[in-house]
Amino acid sequence: MAGVEEADKLKQLGNAAFSERKWHLAIDMYTKAIELTKTPTLFCNRALAELRAELPGAALADADAALGIEPTFAKAYYHKASAYLSLGKHKQALTNYKKVVDLAPQNSDAQAKVEFCKKEIRRINFENAIMTPDEAPLSQTIKLGSVRADYDGPRIENETVTVEFVEAMKEHFRLEKLIDRHDVIFILLEVQKILKKCPNFVSINVPVGEEITVCGDTHGQYYDLLNIFKLNGNPLETNRYLFNGDFVDRGSYSFENIMTLFAYKVLYPDHFFLSRGNHEGVSMNRMYGFEGEVTQKYNSEMFRLFTEVFNSLPIGHIINNEVFVVHGGLYSSDKVTLDDLQHPNRFRDIPESGLICESLWSDPQPMPGRAPSKRGVSCLSFGPDVTETFLNNNNLKLLVRSHEVKDEGYEIEHGGKCITVFSAPNYCDQMGNKGAFIRFTGGDMKPRFTTFTHVPHPGKRPMHYATGFGLF
């Protein structure tokens, strides 16, 4: 009986942490309660916290655990469906939302989710049906068109992206104004030409005494991107930047965010670098806002062109043959070499397994070895011994990755060999975290950290353009 009472106290602490949006603390409290007594409610509470913490794989496992105790527990099916939906797996989500409706016919939210999933499945099937394998890439057939007669914003002159244009474009975006379709397409086609020439993993040379800044996820938080440049200086040939993926989704200024980054890549192709993140892919863009945003601001054809450009992004970078920078992390095999990473075909949507998937989706863990990913994808989390082995085998000194919110904007793990950097402060307008970036100087290559807080942005809330939300 004492165990049950203690579990209830821990559950209440978990509920309190959840109400304060402290998802990981809530997970810890529910876990301690589950160690004392296993109930479907506790497993479902933890599943919901895991969904909020973007750990749908863990949420699926907890929903199944709840159903193992009580096979008709409707809330478990609901969380299971929500986890599948967050992964873009609409058919599996539909199956589980139907279970909820069967068990709770009056649940109007589940009924709405059933209809949403059916609609998305029809839409995706239609889009797949009209695409043919032999169809020429859109980048080869799209027309620039003429500039609108009533357009009075900044223009690309003489087919050249200049500093003056980029600065004017940034200010235009800051005022919530869009640039003409002609110039969007021009930038996308130009940046694609540059990216397609890159290997999967790009080597960056920073001369002795010069610097490079590494930023993590920015997730459509355009006004925070402007603040990074205010704090750290605009990109220049003498002020290098590397943005480590997840430029879009969630934040509702993803178009402005990615266009600014792409314009700088065109302006400084050898001094400004971009890595692909797990959100530079179709399934995430459909769920988390970028498709809806681009379609509303321009049209569906423009989104297709963005998708093609995303498929050209490099997977990672190596700075001065010392620092390995990739969005997610390391691999399911200790034998992976830098040469191995250059071989997979990256010019496609993000695969569900293999080296590219692992590069973009994996996470570090404190314990040695490997464990299944809590994100619900076919990759593993990796321990300090895995990091040590990879770095030693490839004559590297440090892993820098992103992909996870950190309260201080960064976290040093694995005995100083693994650093996570996240550059979207107050993520989704609710997490209260700081953002951070890292500066490295050629020569000593020791990381120096800058943290910063969020700045105000106009009225569009995160997920404004997303479909299927609130999911949970």
Swiss-Prot record:
Active site: H279 (proton donor/acceptor)
TPR repeat ranges, renumbered to this chain: 7-40, 41-73, 74-107
GO cellular component: cytoplasm; cytosol; nucleus
Record SMART domains: PP2Ac, TPR
UniProt cofactor note: Binds 2 Mg(2+) or Mn(2+) cations per subunit.
Domain of life: Eukaryota
Gene Ontology MF annotations: metal ion binding; phosphatase activity; protein serine/threonine phosphatase activity
Positions bound to Mn(2+) 1: D217, H219, D246
Ways its activity is controlled: Activated by arachidonic acid.
Assigned keywords, A-Z: Cytoplasm, Hydrolase, Manganese, Metal-binding, Nucleus, Protein phosphatase, Repeat, TPR repeat
Pfam families: Metallophos, PPP5, TPR_1
Annotated InterPro entries: Calcineurin-like_PHP_ApaH, Metallo-depent_PP-like, PP5_C, PPP_dom, PPP_phosphatase, Ser/Thr-sp_prot-phosphatase, TPR-like_helical_dom_sf, TPR_rpt
Subcellular location: Cytoplasm, Cytosol; Nucleus
Keyword Chloroplast: no
Binding site for Mn(2+) 2: D246, N278, H327, H403
Keyword flag Secreted: no
Cystine bridges: none
Enzyme Commission code(s) on record: 3.1.3.16
Cofactor: Mg(2+); Mn(2+)
Reaction catalysis annotation: O-phospho-L-seryl-[protein] + H2O = L-seryl-[protein] + phosphate; O-phospho-L-threonyl-[protein] + H2O = L-threonyl-[protein] + phosphate
Protein family according to the UniProt entry: Belongs to the PPP phosphatase family. PP-5 (PP-T) subfamily.
Domain comment as written in the entry: The TPR repeats mediate protein-protein interactions with substrate proteins, but also autoinhibit PPT1 phosphatase activity.
Function: May function as a protein phosphatase.
Listed name of the protein: Serine/threonine-protein phosphatase T
